[in-house]
Amino acid sequence: MSGLACNSCNKDFEDDAEQKFHYKSEWHRYNLKRKIAGVPGVTEALFEARQAAIAQEKVKAVEAPMLYSCGICNKGYRSSKAHEQHLKSKSHVLKASTSTGEEDKAIIKQLPPRRVEKNNTAQLKGSIEEEESEDEWIEVDSDEDLDAEMNEDGEEEDMDEDGIEFELDPACCLMCDKKHKTIEKCMVHMHKFHGFFIPDIEYLKDPKGFLTYLGLKVKRDFVCLYCNELCHPFSSLEAVRKHMDAKGHCKVHYGDGGDEEDAELEEFYDYSSSYVNGDENQMVVSGESVNTVELFGGSELVITKRTDNKVTSRTLGSREFMRYYKQKPAPSSQKHIVNSLTSRYKMMGLATVQSKEAIVRMKVMREMNKRGAKSSVRLGMKSNVIRNLPNNVTY
């Protein structure tokens, strides 16, 4: 025993020359790769059988493909094994028993090799030069016009997608998807079963748009109506509904939050009736004292005249639309919905409008809580003791 061996291949050697020759072999390299991967090595016989199988597959890939067709069934196969299985099938045996011996012949044909189309750079350059040499020119708009058209198309597509995907019914409950015939019944249902309360309902001018906006926030954006300062959406509609039900957040964060939160809902309210001066006269915003002339729709001319006391406007139109000008339909108002809900809130003893004292008291309490929290943190840092620890912490 010379004591020379290979640990990867489990083979002994008689001299150094044989060992060095083994280290240069493909078998030893293959076993080294398996050893690095944590897999045991293979014997030399198994490695040679594997190499022979790989070489045979390469030869088959290089050889031209053959088509084995059956004269009786008129079917073709690309491999001999599939053709042999077809010959043993019941359908082929039944047809062979009823047919004559002339048709029972296997036809073997050589398929033409596949042509691989390679894009040569010279051919590409030639085709490009031919295209450039053609005298077919098309006038195009400037870049600004193209960008404007693309932006308009994109906006129209976005509006269409929003309208299709998120068509919300304002008469449908936000919490249980129960549909009602009118918006009034829907708002009464949400207040009775879910505690939904609308602040300053006396000044609500658009109940339909108000409920549609809240429905988009809950059903599309998965955002809570009350604790949405950070606008962190939930994972699903059921998650945000469970959160609002458990926390009692089935209400609108309006009147007691910041200016940014109130600005979201200001367009649905109209506080002009509450602006009263000392003489009990309603105060309105005075416009610019400039006379204006506006054209609407290409068929009407509106002349507006502003003075110190009043604003007058006249409309000049075509005679063909006189039958429409004579009609005076009553303006559609949603005030009856607001009035019914206001009376319902008052019957239950709920304040529809917050008093100034309550708002001032709320701001003072909020400021006191902030100062108390800061002082407790400062005292805890100074004494190196954290006061608000869990009950299971004894120190």
From Swiss-Prot:
Subunit structure comment from the entry: Can form homodimer. Interacts with RLP24, RLP24A, RPL24B, EBP1 and JJJ1.
GO cellular component: cytoplasm; cytosol; nucleus
Recorded GO MF terms: DNA-binding transcription factor activity; transcription cis-regulatory region binding; zinc ion binding
Protein name listed in UniProt: Cytoplasmic 60S subunit biogenesis factor REI1 homolog 2
Subcellular location: Cytoplasm
Its job: Pre-60S-associated factor involved in the cytoplasmic maturation of the 60S subunit. Involved in the dissociation and recycling of other late pre-60S factors before newly synthesized large ribosomal subunits enter translation. Can complement the growth defect of a yeast mutant lacking REI1. Required for leaf growth under cold temperature conditions.
Keywords: Cytoplasm, Metal-binding, Repeat, Ribosome biogenesis, Zinc, Zinc-finger
Biological-process GO terms, alphabetical: cold acclimation; positive regulation of ribosome biogenesis; regulation of DNA-templated transcription; ribosomal large subunit biogenesis; rRNA processing
